[in-house]
């Protein structure tokens, strides 16, 4: 299996190169695509990262997220990740905001939204990536982000406020 190379950008999100994921330097900027999924009740689906993940194990984040690989676009990546991580295919997402995150990891995140009515059990999760998925009401998630921020990926609070 070959290692994937990810896109490296400048601070304007223009591609300046590609690197093996393991060789990324702290100051280098890469691309991520993330998907907010809601249902007709206004609930929000979150995914808990697999406990064995190197980065942020066990933390809750958007239903789908992935680092954009060489040869991919934000759009193609989010469709691929939705199918791989939670078994959704042929989806029609709506492109939302793009945000730059800077800190321990430096990346641009292109957010997408999707409305779908399924129970948490109806999603086919990729066990190597996702521990579980769960629907949260907006009020429940707001309370969780306020009371237990350490259980959630950094930046999720900002993204939730923009949703």
Regions from the language model: what does each represent?
Residues 12, 39-42, 50, 115-120, ...:
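Short loop segments at secondary-structure junctions
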Residues 19-20, 58, 70, 99, ...:
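Nudix hydrolase/Nudix homology domain
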Residues 26-27, 53, 102-105:
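Short glycine/serine/proline-enriched coil/turn segments at secondary-structure junctions
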Residues 1-34, 40:
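Acidic, metal-coordinating catalytic segment for phosphate/diphosphate chemistry
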Residues 45-46, 61-96:
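The catalytic Nudix box helix
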Residues 27-29, 55-60, 134:
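A short, polar/proline- and glycine-enriched secondary-structure boundary/capping micro-motif
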Residues 34-64:
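A glycine-rich, hydrophobic loop/mini-helix early in the fold
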